Regions:
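Hydrophobic h-region of N-terminal signal peptides that target proteins for export
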Residues: 9-18
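Residue-level micro-sites within transmembrane alpha helices that shape
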Residues: 1-2, 13
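Sec-dependent signal peptide recognition
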Residues: 2-8
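Sequence context surrounding c-type heme c attachment/ligation sites in exported
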Residues: 20-79, 85-138
Length: 138
């Protein structure tokens, strides 16, 4: 009986740890609308607040596209991103690319380079090719 209780406790702790590590996308309609119009609205905790400030400050040249927003929308979305941002080196990226963060590299280290250039995947930024809507927290 003791053995069963210990196993249940260990299993429960592992399940709780797995749930705590899952990414979720907080609900913000404007963020989903604006960021989701070109790509999936990436969960805010994937970058640090500093990264989000840099990214939002350069929307006129957002990875080769002009993604400029109105001042009000930009301010509201930035506030949302800062409030829900990740923290620490794990989520920081000098290039502002999510795929350059230590978190992304750790989570995707088993995927070989051939998979990233698969026509159905296209690039590391196409999360929904493998994860579907799960990345959105849906």
């Amino acid at each position: 009986m003791k053995r069963v209780a210990v196993l249940l406790l260990v299993f429960g702790m592992n399940l709780a740890h797995a749930e705590a590590g899952k990414l979720s996308a907080p609900n913000n309609a404007k963020w989903k609308e604006e960021c989701g119009s070109c790509h999936i609205p990436y969960p805010p905790q994937l970058l640090t607040a500093d990264n989000w400030r840099s990214l939002m400050g350069g929307l006129d040249k957002h990875f080769g596209a002009n993604a400029t927003l109105s001042a009000d929308d930009s301010k509201m979305i930035l506030s949302f991103l800062e409030h829900n941002a990740g923290s620490g080196k794990r989520y920081s990226s000098a290039t502002l690319r999510l795929s350059d963060t230590p978190w992304f590299k750790h989570e995707h280290h088993v995927i070989n380079d051939k998979e990233w250039v698969n026509p159905e995947v296209k690039s590391r930024s196409n999360c929904s090719a493998c994860h579907g809507k799960v990345v959105l927290g849906d």
